[in-house]
Amino acid sequence: MRGIAVFLAFISLIFASPLTVKSPLVDDFYTAPDGYESAKLGEILKLRKTPSKLSSMFFEIDIKNSWQLLVRSEDSFGNATAIVTTVIEPYNADPSKVLSYQTFEDSANIECSPSYGMQYGAPWSTVATQIDMALMVPMLKQGYYVVSPDYEGPKSTFTVGRQSGKATLDSIRAILKSNKFTGIKSDAKVAMWGYSGGSLASGWAAALQPKYAPELKKNLIGAALGGFVTNITATAEATDGTLFAGLVPNALSGLANEYPEFKEILYQKVSKAATDNLRQGTEHCIGGAILYFAEDQYFTGDDRAFPGGYGLLKEEVVNKTISENNLMQMDKDYLPDIPIFVYHGALDSIVPISNVHVTYKNWCDWGINSFEFSEDLLNGHITETIVGAPAAITWLEARFDGEPVVKGCKKTSRITNFSYPNISDSTSSIFEGILNSVTGSELGPGVTSDNITLDGLTGFLGNFIDLK
């Protein structure tokens, strides 16, 4: 598998566009100014246009404007921090409608941050963000502003729930104060959407909002959560020794970035032979991690990284840390106050659906106002990314249009979520949006132009050959 990783790295060097985007490691914009600790949560500390054009699937997209904001937030323990969030304005945007899209960054490395990875010229290691951009494009095409926060924060705390949720909410606070330059109204409707790792951030934001950001209740209209991560232990168990084993070191490293005692225990318990392997968890974005760590075993097998196997998870510090970041284990104080839509594949072998069933039961028993759960019987984690997206978009559009939500709880099992009611327009919008982004057409409602433009064609070909 290491050979495949080297081969793909070589291929990426051949096809990648010239790297023009400054890394967050050396970009001063990512550094909070002196005295920022005294700023209010959600306050904008810095502002700039994105240094490079944005791209989807590594093709430039034609939008009206985009900005990066450095926003005051806090970590899991209430310590001051600052996160970057990206605001995207399509042509003919509606300033009263905003989608907060949380990407599946799934990495413990700041060079995997969405604000960096969504820019044209970012390295191919950020492919996960580029794939996620393809799901933002349909919403841009329909005139929604899209905001996407670096919710893992400056420490890259993958799987850390409170950090992710707080950052998402503070990003929303910030964009509602950005009218002077973005045009977004302070009373704009805001919905959240995220798949897989993005659902972890979105779910925690929904759970934290009533107490952490109660003033946002008047703006937030719902959250769509796909491949809903509520139990990170279950994902570790499901992926250990599989193609997606890279999620394990990335997740452990993300937790270690936030919890020093947790990190200390990890490196005490890992075998000497696997120490460097574990350290690599801070080096790879999720695409590279899948290749580098494929089929590695951390808790099972004769050569497992942790000789004590799953016994590691019973260590007091480890158990406490993980439990604090499993949304499934939270009590009713974390009950969302906004409408929730969950779509999940029954065959998901990465994020087992059984844990979503537990969360659904808990939230319903505790009296959640609106929870719609659409279970896809024939799809797993990867395929549901695409199959479930039209259902999510349909549900989100209904929220923005003010249509009634499900009262209480409703769970429906479908052969496929392609059969979710009224998704035909949403399905076409996805493929039209992808086509528009690849061909360089302007994104936004009411935009009419030939789908193939000279700039778009040049940009498309420029991904593969040198046109200079």
Curated annotation (Swiss-Prot):
GO terms for biological process: lipid catabolic process. Its EC number is 3.1.1.3. Glycans are attached at N79, N231, N319, N417, N422, N451. InterPro entries: AB_hydrolase_fold (IPR029058), Lipase_secreted (IPR005152). Pfam families: LIP. Induction: Expression is induced when cells are grown on media containing Tween 80, other Tweens or triglycerides as the sole carbon source, but not in Sabouraud Dextrose Broth or yeast/peptone/dextrose media. Expression is up-regulated during the yeast-to-hyphal transition. Expression is inhibited in the presence of carbohydrates. During host infection, expressed in gastric tissues, but not in infected oral tissues. Expression is induced during biofilm formation. Its main location: secreted. Belongs to the AB hydrolase superfamily. Lipase family. Class Lip subfamily. GO terms for molecular function: lipase activity; triacylglycerol lipase activity. The active site is at S196, D348, H381. It comes from the Eukaryota. SUPFAM superfamilies: alpha/beta-Hydrolases. Secreted lipase that is able to hydrolyze both the neutral triacylglycerols and the monopalmitate ester Tween 40, allowing the use of hydrolyzed products as carbon sources. Has broad lipolytic activity, which may be important for colonization and subsequent infection, therefore contributing to the persistence and virulence in human tissue. It is found in: Secreted. Keywords: Disulfide bond, Glycoprotein, Hydrolase, Lipid degradation, Lipid metabolism, Secreted, Signal, Virulence. Residues 1-16 form the signal peptide. Disulfide bonds join C112-C285, C364-C409. This is Lipase 1. It catalyses: a triacylglycerol + H2O = a diacylglycerol + a fatty acid + H(+). GO terms for cellular component: extracellular region.
